[in-house]
Amino acid sequence: MALVIGLTGGIASGKTTVANLFQQHFAIDIVDADIVARQVVAPGSAGLAAIVDHFGADILTREGELDRGQLRQRIFAHAEEKQWLNALLHPMIRRKMIEDLAQVSSPYALLVVPLLVENQLQTLCDRVLVVDVEEKTQLQRTMDRDGVDEQQVRAILKAQASRHERLALADDVIKNESKDQDLLQQITDLHQKYLAMSKQNR
């Protein structure tokens, strides 16, 4: 299997931008946990069937897709329902990510997982790459991007692993603090490093 680089970072750190640059400039295959999480509850999936069985058919939209807003409301006030959902979906997501990683054709793959640290998914990775920004940058970017207030962003930050926890697990770090920092140069340097490592990994 290809060398697996786990790419993570807090909210608004620039994970998607970094992943896209790896893909656009170096044709690196990406397995994105957010996309996989949507796939395992797509219409016709075992995941969606189990959710409907548990919550009832009104958890679906008219088109037969999962009504995420409805689901969020259901689990928000009921911790046991959230636990049930996580127990169902996390193993499915993990299995699908492993399957997708096995299909990779590039010398190494990026496994993009926002909650890599929180869900202890570093076991799927050969290395962990953290996109790092200061908290004040996360606050400003999220407020600008999502139109939310500081209190809401702080609540999200509190629910995620801390910057310190992420950096403690990092093998490599990309600084994405300002537009002045050359993201592509940092990515190019890491690409060369990962290529060399992937040759040793064969």
From Swiss-Prot:
Alphabetized InterPro entries for the sequence: Depp_CoAkinase (IPR001977), P-loop_NTPase (IPR027417)
Catalysis performed (reactions): 3'-dephospho-CoA + ATP = ADP + CoA + H(+)
GO-annotated cellular components: cytoplasm
Pathway recorded for this protein: Cofactor biosynthesis; coenzyme A biosynthesis; CoA from (R)-pantothenate: step 5/5
GO MF: ATP binding; dephospho-CoA kinase activity
UniProtKB keywords: ATP-binding, Coenzyme A biosynthesis, Cytoplasm, Kinase, Nucleotide-binding, Transferase
Gene3D superfamilies, per database record: P-loop containing nucleotide triphosphate hydrolases (3.40.50.300)
Domain DPCK: 4-201
Compartment list: Cytoplasm
Annotated positions binding ATP: A12, S13, G14, K15, T16, T17
UniProt xrefs under SUPFAM superfamilies: P-loop containing nucleoside triphosphate hydrolases
PROSITE patterns: DPCK
One Pfam family, short name: CoaE
EC number: 2.7.1.24
Record GO biological process: coenzyme A biosynthetic process
Primary location class: cytoplasm
Family membership noted in the UniProt record: Belongs to the CoaE family.
Described function: Catalyzes the phosphorylation of the 3'-hydroxyl group of dephosphocoenzyme A to form coenzyme A.
Descriptive protein name: Dephospho-CoA kinase
Source organism: Vibrio vulnificus (strain YJ016)
